[in-house]
Amino acid sequence: MKIENKLKEMGLELPTATPAPAGRAGAVQVGNILFVGGHTPGSAHQGKLGDDFTVEQGYEAARQACLNCLADIKATIGDLDNVKQVVKLFCMVNCTPDFGQQPQVANGATDLLSELYGDSGAHARSAVGMSALPNGASIEIEMILEIN
């Protein structure tokens, strides 16, 4: 089944890719590797985990940030079915110093990629806490993909 059809079946909508500021790109292809720059979940998810958001809300924010990554992936390579393997996911979590559940938050993105791509969605991952992220975002995600 096509990835975009899976998204619809899951009740999820692929957002429109947001143009990157001048001099940058949302994603850059080098050979068969696609580097996806940092994506946040949007203005509805501004704040800190451990203070403004629960782990469950962070999970949903990571899922939304991943959807925003997928929008730029589609804009760059034309079709989400051209992803051969998700190689690496880097999830940055804006959190309080005592918050230690970054992996559980990052699972929002990991689970989505697994649901969409199956074994090809399995990836190496880092989930780290940050004292701040751009524009107060709760989550920022970067990805590296192998494409067909």
Language model region names:
Residues 1-148:
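Short, polar/acidic, helix-capping and beta-turn segments at strand->helix junctions
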